[in-house]
Amino acid sequence: MEKRLICIGGGDLKTKETVKIDGYIADLAKKHAGENRAYGLFIPTASHDCMPYFNSFRKTYTSVYDIKADVALTVYGEMSLSKIEEKFAKADFIYVGGGETVFMLEHWKKTGLLELITQAYERGVIICGLSAGAICWFQTMYTDSESVRGDSAYELHSGLGWINSTISPHYNVRMLD
């Protein structure tokens, strides 16, 4: 089974900044789905299950690419594990949103969501993500997660190590420290 991991360093779904890569993801998802309508599962853990973020995902992938969009809410206990497992079983691609990376990884490990994502990846489900959803797969990630808690702006943190490299998201122009 071919495995695909698509990492989007930054951008905004709502303003269509990522439309070219979204189109690429949609094409892959449709191939994965075969004769069925493609199904995309949005994971908004890093944004603490922000529903407006999911609505932007749904609007883009449903209206532009005709993909069934769904969401897995886990931060506040809205969905049972069995319901989330059903959604993972249907997914042609999983899209991990941006936000607080360190919180997201801690939450995934605590709740078992990481195991579901790993199993989906192993069976050929396309995994993609933006910002926190992109950098989490790397050995080392340069993230501002601690700034949410009032600490320094950017620091190196250990990621999941699926990609043996280091990443810095949202890089446009080098800034002087």
Where are these regions (language model features)?
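N-terminal beta1-alpha1 cap of cysteine-dependent amidohydrolase-like domains
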Residues: 2-93
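Short glycine-rich anion-binding loops that position phosphate/pyrophosphate groups of nucleotides
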Residues: 11, 46, 99-102, 133
